Curated annotation (Swiss-Prot):
GO molecular-function terms, A-Z: 2 iron, 2 sulfur cluster binding; electron transfer activity; flavin adenine dinucleotide binding; metal ion binding; oxidoreductase activity
Family per similarity comment: Belongs to the PyrK family.
Gene symbol of the encoding locus: pyrK
Free-text function comment from the UniProt entry: Responsible for channeling the electrons from the oxidation of dihydroorotate from the FMN redox center in the PyrD type B subunit to the ultimate electron acceptor NAD(+).
Keyword annotations from UniProtKB, A to Z: 2Fe-2S, Electron transport, FAD, Flavoprotein, Iron, Iron-sulfur, Metal-binding, Pyrimidine biosynthesis, Transport
Co-factor remark: Binds 1 [2Fe-2S] cluster per subunit.
Cofactor(s), names only, from the UniProt record: [2Fe-2S] cluster; FAD
Classification via SUPFAM superfamilies: Ferredoxin reductase-like, C-terminal NADP-linked domain, Riboflavin synthase domain-like
Matches recorded under InterPro entries: Cyt_c3_hydrogenase_gsu, Dihydroorotate_DH_ele_sf, Dihydroorotate_DH_Fe-S-bd, Dihydroorotate_DHASE_ETsu, FAD-bd_FR_type, FNR_nucleotide-bd, OxRdtase_FAD/NAD-bd, PyrK_electron_transfer
Protein's name in the database: Dihydroorotate dehydrogenase B (NAD(+)), electron transfer subunit
Gene Ontology BP terms: 'de novo' UMP biosynthetic process
Residues the entry annotates as binding FAD: 53-56, 70-72, 77-78
Sequence ranges assigned to domain FAD-binding FR-type in this UniProt record: 2-102
Coiled coil: none
């Protein structure tokens, strides 16, 4: 159930170039039960920036009432968020959206988790949930260069993990699809989050597979009221039917929405 709460900053640190790990504490964590959901963060105390920032939930610890989120500090809002210190309060709205369907993967099956850039973040909680129910996980993490690689070791603790960098400075040179081809990776179910170009490439290959993708869209309200994040349905070529990424998603079955 969505709530609004001022949460305490437990810790914040830069874990890769311009990539920050922020841990917040509050009872709101008890509502975080679906990997792939997100929160809407008020990044500053004053009026500006006006809009909240949507950030994926990376890890949940309900025993400690803590959750972790990862984000890239690149605009005014996220750069402001990166200055928050331990003990300060952050205004959080969430959890929002529909997450990854863990129940679609069965014990003994193999799940392929493919993340690109900051889209790697929500796959960490998902991977933990899948492993807990006896699903074998394989991770492919795609980045531009080695300076922005994060959480490789954490994913490796859960299952086979491959990294691709566009410039070849770490792992396989190229894209996540190059890793799949090079190692001949097979799987029963696919979960993915990342840039549209990556999601389109996966959709072109695996439209007939059981697969789910999480969209990274700019949002205004985060609750489905402003229509800033609509996407059209593939089954309706007229373009009149749509879904809202913030409330109907951000996770959709592959092939459902136009990428």
């Amino acid at each position: 159930m969505m709530q609004k709460q001022n949460m305490i900053v437990v810790n914040q640190k830069e874990i890769a170039k311009n990539i920050y790990e922020l841990v917040l504490q509050g009872t709101l964590v008890q509502q975080m039960n679906e990997p792939g959901q997100f929160v809407h963060i008020k990044v500053a105390e004053g009026i500006a920036p006006l809009l909240r920032r949507p950030i994926s939930i990376c890890n949940v610890d309900q025993e400690k009432n803590e959750f972790t989120m990862l984000y890239r500090a690149e605009g005014q809002g996220t750069k402001t968020l990166a200055t928050r210190k331990q003990g300060e309060m952050v205004d959080v709205l969430g959890p929002l959206g529909h997450g990854f369907p863990v129940e679609e993967a069965e014990a003994g099956q193999t799940a392929l988790l493919v993340g690109g850039g900051i889209g790697v973040s929500p796959l960490y909680e998902l991977s933990q949930r899948l492993v807990a129910k006896g699903v074998r996980v394989i991770h492919i993490l795609g980045f531009q260069t080695k300076d922005v690689v994060f959480y490789e070791e954490k994913f490796a603790e859960l299952g086979d993990t491959y990294v691709a960098t566009v410039d070849g400075t770490h792992g396989t040179k190229g894209f996540v699809t190059d890793v799949i081809d090079h190692y001949g990776i097979d799987f029963d179910i696919l979960y993915s989050c990342g840039p549209l170009a990556m999601l389109r490439a996966l959709e072109g290959r695996y439209k007939e597979k059981k697969a789910y993708i999480s969209l990274e869209e700019r949002m205004g309200c985060g609750i489905g009221a402003c229509f800033a994040c609509v996407c059209h349905l593939q089954e309706d070529p007229s373009g009149h039917s749509y879904k809202k990424v913030c409330s109907d998603g951000p996770v959709f079955p592959i092939g459902e929405v136009v990428l």
